A protein has these predicted regions:
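Bacterial N-terminal signal peptides
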Residues: 1-9
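Sec/Tat signal peptide C-region and signal peptidase I cleavage site
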Residues: 11-13
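Low-complexity, Ser/Thr/Pro/Gly-enriched N-terminal "stalk/linker" regions
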Residues: 16-104
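Aromatic-rich carbohydrate-recognition surfaces in CAZymes
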Residues: 99-127, 131-203
Length: 203
């Protein structure tokens, strides 16, 4: 009898917790988790239009909410776009919460936006900047996988027993550190027809 009561009580608690979780999820779905517009690092009209287009196609509210918040996250929070001293686009892409740029990660982070490049000149220029920055990084050290935004040694891996230049964040060679920039450059060129990225920095 007691065991049955305890089991029933446990089931009731579990049921209550599930109800609370569903309420929290429902609240979250109504909430926009993107940064305020003024705090977004890069804005693309083509990306915003794509979000609205896909929202209408997704019948599941949770999936629509996830796409709305996740698809633009790289642009909102990690892309630092500017012009270099040579006047060419230069885009440094943080890898999440680490203020360094991984060759592999940055190539994957901006990949979904390439399909929209022809609809947004600023987005196209930003993507070209990612590729040009990747080429510069590889020319600094083809055996490094992650780079700082300039010659700013951050101290994390400077004591590694390898040739650590001040521009490097990590020097842990991976074959995909070279594959991803090549993949991104080819995809960008095939999509846009823009061959200007293949300049003197090109490998």
């Amino acid at each position: 009898m007691l065991a049955g009561m305890l089991l029933c009580g446990g089931q009731l608690q579990a049921s209550n917790r599930m109800t609370e979780m569903h309420v929290c999820l429902a609240d979250a779905i109504q909430k926009d988790n993107r940064p305020e517009i003024s705090n977004r690092l890069f804005r693309s009209n083509a990306v915003e239009k794509e979000i609205l287009r896909v929202q209408k196609l997704l019948k599941n509210a949770k999936l629509a909410w996830m796409f709305t918040n996740c698809f633009p996250n790289t642009l909102d929070t990690t892309v630092h776009f500017r012009k270099g001293s040579d006047g060419k686009p230069d885009t440094f892409v943080y890898t999440g919460d680490i203020h360094a740029m991984w060759l592999r990660d940055s190539g994957a982070q901006v990949w979904p936006y390439v399909q929209l490049a022809n609809a947004d000149p600023e987005l196209k220029e930003m993507l070209a900047g990612v590729i040009l920055r990747q080429f510069k990084c590889i020319n600094i050290d083809p055996y490094a996988n992650a780079f700082n935004d300039g010659a700013i040694p951050d101290g994390h891996w400077m004591s590694d027993l390898t040739d650590m230049k001040p521009e490097l964040h990590e020097r842990k060679w991976e074959i995909d550190s070279l594959c991803y920039p090549l993949r991104l450059a080819y995809h960008y060129w095939k999509t846009t027809g823009d061959a200007s990225i293949f300049n003197e920095e090109w490998i």
